[in-house]
Amino acid sequence: MTLGPVGRRMEEALRTALSPDHLEIVDESARHAGHAGANPAGESHFHVIVVSPAFAGKSLVQRHRMVNEALGDLLGERVHALRVTARAPGE
């Protein structure tokens, strides 16, 4: 699936902040159409899968915070829900 403008901004922010070995961003908005917080234009619900050396030695909570910090204002402006899978290489 091709990412829209919000997904592309997320990808750029995560690549810049975390230098991931693997990054996958899945727009799950269609699965939430009609739910509270769903934007009719889409790009409101995402799942990000990130494998980054930056996560080595970090707890799950720390990893999620790192992802949230990297995405910054996108989380409040456009992204209603974010599911995160964050791993260090080899996990």
Per-range role (PLM):
Residues 19-21, 42-46, 78-82:
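A generic structural signal for short beta-strands and their flanking turns/coil linkers
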